[in-house]
């Protein structure tokens, strides 16, 4: 078995190593779809499906306490999270200035840290 912290660490390190992918995933999917050839879109969807299956298999192997429904619930929380995390971890100088001028008190955090905390929370629910 793996602890929640071990799984969270593994997934956080995995995402931290794939920043370019996260940047692409955070873009407007309708624009990407509109401007992509079908074979490239299919290739992406195959990879995406394989990633989902890999997470399901990891949870089945290392989290015996999670039934299929709980594993699926995790996957369908984790993957949407992945699509949106990049903009929270890479903030431009202009965005920082705009937030300051808007009076937004935003705490900047690393991709690893945000992912670790979120995954651990998802696993415990």
Across the structure, where does each feature detected by a protein language model lie?
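Amphipathic alpha-helix face/heptad-repeat signature
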Residues: 44-48, 74, 111, 118
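A short small-residue
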Residues: 32-35, 70, 98-102
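Short secondary-structure transition hinges
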Residues: 8-53, 106
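Short, solvent-exposed secondary-structure capping/transition elements
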Residues: 20-24, 68, 90-91
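Short, well-structured alpha-helical interface segments that form or flank functional binding sites
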Residues: 6, 50, 54, 69, ...
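Hydrophobic alpha-helical connector segments
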Residues: 1-21, 71-78
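C-terminal peripheral helix-coil segments that are non-catalytic and often amphipathic
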Residues: 53-65, 81-125
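Amphipathic alpha-helical linker/stalk segments
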Residues: 1-9, 26, 58-63
